[in-house]
């Protein structure tokens, strides 16, 4: 049963449902990609300012943070929605210029946060909250356009590839005690999402060969595409080495694959996401993928550059998420509330993982869509379920956490054990913390590591062409280490001594790689 204030909150949301739906549909038809959500952020900020809320803009490029109260003695609850879409250009409402589409339902999250703000900013409701509420539109949850984001990193515009990681880095969440997040569903459901999720790391691979006439003089070339083919097959044969309990996922794509069929490819590039249940699991898998890429380079005589980018940390469940269940039960009607608790693990990843390592994270799922998320067939099924229901749930969770003396919020905060403090996450310099959290130690530049020294040696021994810039490139390498496991692979005494001295070429320490 709802108490009087809960009834008022739901009535306030229902009274503004047309505005909530209109806002959501506006975002639906004008999706933007991560760190580029200027229009969406501007729309959200305008509504928050219209409610008289103090609002900060441009956080982590496009983030928007609004405060219900200017100060408070109680806990601060952050209701968080994600601004960005996915690059799915064949979706019916994809942005014709960028291909962005809201195929993950982030527009529903933003509608939920916006609708909750409409209700909680009512003076009577706000007075009943012993604490503060932050309404946050965050950028770049989807880890896409990796090359573009890497360029933004080089320019100093961002340091991490996802928005929440950037917000943590710049201190925009320092005053937040509990974060509440929402996920859209293509089923009619009311779900308490208190599960763990995989973390991941991202790899960029570049094979550098030599172009030649593929018909007239293929022997003069070094085929970077062949190197990539060998590497991808080598990755596939690694899969049987991944332990089931580590829930490892390795998936990638070619981002550049040569320019013409009759020209030996001299520049082939790939992106890989490497996921696992624990940091140790996905770092182990990443080493195996790196090893597979080196195998392709060794076999063909190509140069190889490996760039390692931090992804997201695994999501850590809270000990008590019953407040989410209680809020869902008030709006679910005859549909039962379901749970995915700590015993359930998802192989997906998200930048909520980084948040969950430092502060309590409460999450819920609601429906209103049909089709398949992250697919071109996702479409709106029920505007009320998709947009208005999340607003009620967001607002009810905030109220339940902060009603009275905010006992439920304080209990969650007291039972939470941080995996990383802010200081541990950021480190003493605040620059390479995320890399350290992922077991990565090297700074962001210079990029990559190279096998060209090894290629030069093999070229001398076997009279094969080698990368023309091998000596120059190898001078750029910033770190080397030894891996005893590689030494025993080579039995020829004449070559073995060279490999013993230079086996770091087989297992080099690349940008951001520690092992």
Give the predicted meaning of each segment.
Residues 91-101, 107-108, 123-251, 258-263:
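Histidine/acidic-residue-rich, glycine-tolerant segments that coordinate divalent metal ions
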């Amino acid at each position: 049963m709802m108490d009087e204030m809960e009834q008022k909150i739901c009535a306030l949301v229902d009274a503004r449902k047309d505005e909530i739906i209109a806002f959501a549909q506006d975002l639906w038809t004008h999706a933007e990609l991560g760190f580029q959500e200027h229009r969406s952020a501007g729309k959200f900020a305008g509504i928050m300012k219209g409610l008289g809320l103090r609002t900060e803009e441009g956080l982590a490029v496009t983030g928007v943070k609004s405060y219900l109260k200017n100060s408070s003695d109680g806990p601060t609850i952050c209701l968080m929605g994600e601004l960005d879409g996915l690059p799915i250009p064949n979706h019916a409402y994809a942005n014709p210029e960028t291909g962005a589409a809201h195929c993950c339902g982030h527009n529903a999250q933003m509608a939920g946060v916006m609708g909750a703000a409409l209700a909680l900013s009512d003076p009577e409701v706000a007075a009943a909250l012993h604490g503060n509420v932050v309404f946050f539109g965050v950028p770049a949850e989807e880890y896409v356009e990796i090359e573009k984001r890497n360029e933004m990193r080089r320019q100093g515009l961002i340091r991490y590839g996802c928005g929440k990681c950037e917000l943590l880095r710049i201190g925009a969440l320092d005053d937040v005690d509990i974060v509440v997040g929402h996920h859209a569903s293509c089923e009619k459901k009311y779900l308490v999402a208190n599960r763990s999720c995989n973390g991941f790391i991202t790899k960029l691979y570049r094979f550098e060969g030599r172009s030649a006439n593929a018909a007239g003089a293929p022997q003069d070339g070094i085929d970077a595409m062949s190197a990539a083919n060998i590497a991808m097959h080598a990755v596939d044969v690694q899969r049987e080495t991944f332990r089931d309990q580590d829930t490892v996922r390795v998936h990638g794509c070619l981002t550049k694959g040569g320019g013409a069929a009759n020209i030996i490819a001299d520049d082939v590039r790939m992106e890989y996401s490497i996921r696992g249940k624990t940091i140790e699991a996905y770092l182990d898998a990443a080493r195996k993928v790196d090893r597979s890429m080196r195998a392709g380079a060794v076999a063909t005589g190509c140069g190889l550059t490996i760039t390692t980018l931090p992804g997201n940390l695994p999501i850590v469940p809270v000990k008590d998420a019953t407040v989410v269940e209680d809020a869902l039960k008030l709006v679910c009607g005859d549909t039962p509330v379901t749970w995915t608790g700590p015993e359930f693990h998802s192989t997906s990843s998200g930048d909520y993982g980084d948040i969950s390592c430092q502060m309590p994270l409460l999450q819920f799922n609601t429906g209103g869509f049909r089709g398949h998320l992250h697919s071109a067939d996702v479409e709106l099924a029920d505007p009320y379920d998709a947009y208005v229901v999340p607003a009620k749930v967001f607002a009810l969770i905030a109220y339940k956490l902060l009603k009275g003396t905010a006992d439920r919020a304080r209990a969650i905060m007291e039972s939470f054990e941080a995996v990383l403090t802010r200081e541990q996450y950021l480190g003493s310099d605040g620059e390479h913390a995320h890399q350290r959290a992922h077991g990565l130690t090297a700074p962001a530049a210079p990029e990559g590591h190279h096998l060209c020294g090894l290629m030069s040696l093999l070229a001398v021994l076997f009279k094969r062409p080698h990368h023309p810039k091998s000596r120059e490139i190898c001078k750029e390498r910033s770190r080397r280490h030894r891996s005893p496991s590689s030494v025993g692979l080579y039995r020829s005494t004449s070559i073995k001594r060279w490999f013993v001295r230079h086996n770091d070429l087989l297992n080099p320490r690349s940008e951001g790689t520690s092992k």
